[in-house]
């Protein structure tokens, strides 16, 4: 963990140093090391630290990482790629330590927790992911963002429902649709309005699941994980996941669950922020702790190949500053 102490606006940055690698620290950079396993460490610093000015004019002792932060790094740092398991990750973006999105303070003197906000890149499968995985219960148990408040999103899902009904030849009486991370039911409501009878939302935020059920959009409150599968009706004709693949820390388990719920002739349609647009348009504000992953079509293809699932169509959509919509069998 290091930070330039000359520049007052410099961020605190983390960096993983794997076995056999050399870490070079520039002058005037405060730094400390958090060892994740028993390690033989060789310090190549020149000169003795116990000199006459030690602790007076330079080499001043400073608690740069306290016990709480050390525990956070040890427990929540993601050392391997969520997609392929590769451990050789390279940091490509650091926005320093930041609070959780929408975590607004009620009082001037209130304090909020800060977490590293950094993107690491996997050169093996081209996945991009955050360095720290914040506990999802802290972010999603009482989620503040309701998708239906946005007219743009409401219209987006209305048009999407019409498109899927026509292209996939969905039957109003028989077809069964599941929406993962369904929020307040914004993506399922248009199907009900079109006369489709069987829908199910899966939403971890209690407040949003309660709101959806109140509006007669059947919703299961919980994460999509194997322990919950027995509570969910399967054989779906269509499974939707809009921006969910950005929000999931347990990608492989979630994907296995989705495939197990899909009917033989069913289709999975995923919408996710498009990394190419983030890079091209410099939309760094789309990088925040809820978005564990940042996808390109190549990295999505590499990911789904592991499950013998095929992306048979991909198209660009305008949501979230530019997104991908992919169709999977």
Regions found by a protein language model. Give the residues of each.
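Short, glycine-/aromatic-enriched active-site segment of Class I SAM-dependent methyltransferases
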Residues: 270-293, 297-299
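Conserved class I S-adenosyl-L-methionine
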Residues: 173-183
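Conserved SAM-binding strand-loop segment of SAM-dependent methyltransferases
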Residues: 216-228
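A conserved beta-strand element that flanks and buttresses the S-adenosyl-L-methionine
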Residues: 240
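Short acidic-glycine-tyrosine-enriched beta hairpin
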Residues: 6-27
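N-terminal juxtadomain amphipathic helix
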Residues: 74-152, 315
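Double-stranded beta-helix
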Residues: 6, 11, 30-71
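A short glycine-rich, Lys/Arg-flanked "PGG" loop and its adjoining helix->strand segment in the class I
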Residues: 252-267
């Amino acid at each position: 963990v290091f930070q330039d102490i000359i520049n007052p606006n410099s961020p605190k940055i983390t960096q993983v140093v794997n076995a056999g690698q050399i870490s070079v620290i520039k002058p005037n950079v405060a730094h400390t090391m958090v060892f994740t396993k028993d390690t033989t460490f060789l310090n190549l610093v020149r000169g003795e630290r116990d000199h006459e000015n030690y602790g007076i004019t330079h080499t001043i002792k400073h608690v740069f990482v306290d016990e709480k932060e050390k525990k956070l790094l040890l427990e929540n740092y993601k050392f391997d790629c969520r997609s392929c398991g590769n451990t050789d990750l390279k940091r490509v973006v650091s926005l320093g330590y930041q609070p959780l999105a929408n975590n607004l303070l009620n009082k001037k003197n209130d304090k909020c927790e800060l977490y590293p906000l950094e993107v690491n890149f996997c050169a093996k499968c081209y996945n991009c992911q955050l360095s720290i995985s914040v506990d999802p219960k802290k972010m999603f148990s009482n989620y503040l963002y309701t998708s239906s408040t946005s007219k743009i999103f409401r219209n987006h899902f209305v048009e999407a429902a019409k498109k899927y009904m026509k292209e996939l030849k969905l039957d109003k009486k028989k077809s069964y649709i599941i929406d993962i991370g369904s929020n307040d039911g914004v993506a399922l409501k248009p199907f009900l309005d079109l006369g489709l009878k069987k829908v199910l939302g899966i939403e971890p935020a209690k407040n949003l699941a309660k709101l959806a059920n109140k509006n007669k959009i059947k919703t299961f409150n919980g994460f999509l994980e194997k322990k919950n599968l027995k509570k969910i009706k399967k054989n779906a004709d269509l499974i939707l996941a809009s921006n969910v693949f950005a929000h999931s820390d347990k990608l492989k388990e979630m994907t296995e669950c989705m495939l197990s719920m899909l009917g033989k002739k069913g289709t999975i349609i995923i919408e996710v922020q498009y990394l190419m647009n983030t890079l091209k348009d410099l939309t760094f504000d789309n990088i925040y702790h809820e978005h564990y992953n940042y996808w390109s079509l190549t990295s999505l293809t590499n990911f789904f190949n592991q499950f013998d699932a095929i992306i048979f169509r991909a198209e660009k959509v305008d949501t979230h500053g530019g997104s991908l919509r992919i169709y999977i069998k």
